[in-house]
């Protein structure tokens, strides 16, 4: 009888070990965990664009009262901007240091997307001039009004200018 219980005990231990090996690993397995640090970095993003092609401002009439040429005006260009930066401004500049004729630019009908338009800017040199201030974390737009002015003393001629718009600190 002693041998019978010994075999039962041995068989029971073997059966338990087999069951643990076969099924117990799933029931008693340890979970594995891995961690990762993810850095999110958003860089300052500025975009500026123009809707409208090249312009030709033609002065071709005289003001009868002042005996001076009437200015040529065009407001068909739209300026669009987006910036996620703080305290930005939009500056405008020309590539001509000493222009012969006067060109003025005014930002009109500014959208609610941020920015305050400065008064009309005269491009009398090639330095940048503030056009819109207070652009901050926004997308906005405005119409650009160009005014070309000539004096009779300046005579006739053509002058082509490359106008540059820049979002910058300010």
Model-derived regions, located:
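Charged interaction patches that mediate protein-protein contacts
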Residues: 1-2, 22
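Bacterial N-terminal signal peptides that target proteins for export
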Residues: 2-14
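C-terminal segment of classical bacterial N-terminal signal peptides
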Residues: 18-28
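N-terminal small/polar-rich segments of proteins
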Residues: 28-116, 121-170
